[in-house]
Amino acid sequence: MTVQKFITYNSVDINGKTLSDEYKLELNVLEKSGNYLIHKDILRHQSSQRQGTISTKTRSEVRGGGRKPWRQKGTGRARAGSSRSPLWKGGGVIFGPKPRKIILKLNKKERKLALQTLLYNKRNNISIIDNLETNLDLPKTKTFYSLCKNCEINLDQKILIIVGEKTIPLKLATRNIKNVELILASNLNTFSLLKAKQILMTPLAVKDIKEIYCG
């Protein structure tokens, strides 16, 4: 059963000062089976990240082994037809992995519902920073560090920054910080959301989330 929930946030500037602007998110949230749906979507996301290129050689693909090692009878040893038998060192692999595609499908409505439910569950960890994409004047890591200090953001925890557009100063300022992930609102996924302990959004990202996932 889905329930409509409303979340309202005040934005802050890069100096940590609270602004008068209010941003509201209207989310459709699953009450009982929400965790199950989130888990399904995370499995779908993780399976899509797999390369699936692992490959082993069978006895017919291993080089060599065309000649019979010794005659069939009279030697006292066990009979052998090829030195590339899976029983031999350097032989082929029995039932080894081969390249394959692993695709787990989830309906678009279910994916949106899982994302909205997780956003609601993480509502207390979300902060909206006004014009984060454009207000970082210097593309330096220390600029972002000072922003985190002003906004009381703990850099020892996983931080997810959701933006409407990736600007070069913001990308350069955050790329050397191991706990920070920068993501477009259009590419938002449950896996990144679940890992994050603190979530920073921009007003443009809130607008995109409303249009893409809450419509």
UniProtKB/Swiss-Prot annotation:
The keyword Zinc does not apply. GO terms for biological process: translation. Residues 48-85 are annotated as: Disordered. It comes from the Eukaryota. GO terms for molecular function: rRNA binding; structural constituent of ribosome. Residues 48-57 have a biased composition (Polar residues). Transmembrane segments: none annotated. Residues 65-76 have a biased composition (Basic residues). Its main location: plastid. GO terms for cellular component: chloroplast; ribonucleoprotein complex; ribosome. It is found in: Plastid, Chloroplast. It holds the Pfam family Ribosomal_L4. The keyword Transit peptide does not apply. Keywords: Chloroplast, Plastid, Ribonucleoprotein, Ribosomal protein, RNA-binding, rRNA-binding. Part of the 50S ribosomal subunit. PANTHER family: 50S RIBOSOMAL PROTEIN L4, LARGE RIBOSOMAL SUBUNIT PROTEIN UL4C. Probably binds the 23S rRNA. This is Large ribosomal subunit protein uL4c.
